Amino acid sequence: MEFDEIKKHSLNCNADVLSSLQASAPASSPHTVTLKVNAVAEATITEKRNQQQNVQKDFDSHNRDCDSPVSSTSELEKEFDDLRNLHTSSLTNSVVLGKSIGSLNGDYSVTSASSRTKTLENVVTIDSASGSTCLAIASPVDHIKKRIPNSRTPTRKALRIKFYRNGDRFYPGITIPVSNERYRSFERLYEDLTRLLEENVKIPGAVRTIYNMCGKKITSLDELEDGQSYVCSCNNENFKKVEYNTGSQPLSNLTLTNNSRSNNQRLAKCRPASPLKNGLLTGISPLPASGGGTGNGSPLIASRLSDRVSVVHPRIVTLIRSGTKPRRIMRLLLNKRNSPSFDHVLTAITQVVRLDTGYVRKVFTLSGISVVQLSDFFGSDDVFFAYGTERINYAEDFKLEAEEYRAINVIRKTMRTAGTTCKGPKPKMPIKSKKVYPPLVDSEVLKAATSPEDDSHATLLTSTGIEINELPLNIRNTYTLGRIIGDGNFAIVFKIKHRQTGDSYALKIIDKNKCKGKEHYIDAEVRVMKKLNHPHIISLILSVDQNTNMYLVLEYVSGGDLFDAITQVTRFSESQSRIMIRHLGAAMTYLHSMGIVHRDIKPENLLVKLDEHGNVLELKLADFGLACEVNDLLYAVCGTPTYVAPEILLEVGYGLKIDVWAAGIILYILLCGFPPFVAPDNQQEPLFDAIISGIYEFPDPYWSDIGDGVRDLIANMLQSDPDVRFTSEDILDHYWTIGNKGNDL
């Protein structure tokens, strides 16, 4: 009796289902058998599909856990083909149902083991020549699962290798990951090392040889060891056994990846904290480093660190580059950031002078004395010759030509103090600007007042053109209005008092109508002040924005501004000036660390707190109307003429250091009572020409009793070249600022 061929799309059945079909076949007619088989098939199809989906999901999850899905799939397909061939050769008159487990598309197929069977895709075929059916299901899923790991198969970890430049004991080296996957050949490693070294140092050619630290030549990647250091040689140079800079930085801090092409770590050092920040000047010892170990706390190391701190201070040195006369002359700012050791100073000099022979190896003073230790750079000499590996002619090299001598004198022009006497009358301070207020308001405003207090408020506001009803309600109800304590181009400042606590504050009213097109300055001032929290910066208590005015409630300082204090006392002592420059330097350092430039530092914007004898106790920086965040060079010409930096006038772009220039002008004024750059009748053009020239003096008799330390600080703050001008941190680190420990804080 022949059976009808049963077709069902995507039908997957097991031996039990086929057995039930066989058992019912003889007792039923062909049509009945077909109906029963269909019923059974329909009842089980949903269950079988769910099982198939679960198997596929389980297999896909294992595929994702494998490191290489493609390679894993190909291996599984190969294994399944072997199993299928094995069943094909051993089974006869049977149906083999196979699922292509290794296939990424998840298709299913049914294959016949013999020519005596009928084969249809996605169809179960029953042999009509025999009364029974032998079904063999070749499903290697269980066997394959055993071979799939439960976690990701680890790949070979890349080696972290540090490479030095052959014969260069100053170069700190670069660290890169090295693996067979990244570098298929040794030549590829040579090319990458050549590129990386060219970005950091000057090399004579391409890298052609790699040595270990003992001088053994490395010929394959397998010879490299993880965490070890090696030496790169260009143009097949012989190995040079020198003391390489192995202690410059930890290996973990010097990793270079393919995407970091500019990771020059030679000067990427953490700047030591200023003595004004770490407690050295207050008698409070800094906290010890975490870990409690004794290795870094030995008396020997502590004494070395103490000596280094006492030796290194910010200063500008003049460098003469070796070569054909007249030789190039340049300047370099040395400070704790780039001069923690003798080798670091040589590295900094190398980057400035750029010798044809590579690194600077020898440095001499102007008199031909060799510089051999760190303290030599911070002694009495400030002009140095820089040499590489070239031969030195001691008889001729240390003689300056006339042109070289003139160039050095031009650089030293700001230090010309000897024999200079002020001719004519004493220079005067610029006039403090006064605001011309608008005309009085209508008399109806005065009649609207309902109390004597309101009458006084209205009278006061009338003189400024502001109506009492314009004040925000929360300010009017919380504070009582006092006298005018300051004014500017767009704003008026009142003293106000809290009604409940009696504390004094300052109310700054900014007239929006007078700064049309410059509203962004107002927004910037509020935005910047909300970010600030420093003891030497005025705090913002409250801000209220209205259509016509912006109202700012600020911290109040009782002594008024520094301009009025200078007018009263004319000049301050070095001790008093030191206090003020410390506080101003600390405020600028805080601002600059946040990438904010003030752009209008002047005595009118510095508020002071005085004692009963008129001595300055505290200084605070105020008025952030021109302050902004620095993301790139700025070009807007702004500020006050007397305090504006030369790069602003030249419109070549400026940054944070314009604040340092302004602070240098203020320090000069504090000590003598007038600015270094003046012009007759306060004319701007001659004044700007003087600022751009950078030439000023310390004339007698006004400077005859002032020490060289503060003159040196001023000279470094008033450098026309921003690259060598002091930073705000350098001001705090200067030996004059640090002096007189106990009494000036």
Curated annotation (Swiss-Prot):
GO terms for biological process: intracellular signal transduction. It catalyses: L-seryl-[protein] + ATP = O-phospho-L-seryl-[protein] + ADP + H(+); L-threonyl-[protein] + ATP = O-phospho-L-threonyl-[protein] + ADP + H(+). Residues 57-67 have a biased composition (Basic and acidic residues). GO terms for molecular function: ATP binding; protein serine kinase activity; protein serine/threonine kinase activity. It comes from the Eukaryota. Residues 49-73 are annotated as: Disordered. Residues 479-737 form the Protein kinase domain. Belongs to the protein kinase superfamily. CAMK Ser/Thr protein kinase family. CaMK subfamily. This is Serine/threonine-protein kinase GG21441. It comes from Drosophila erecta.
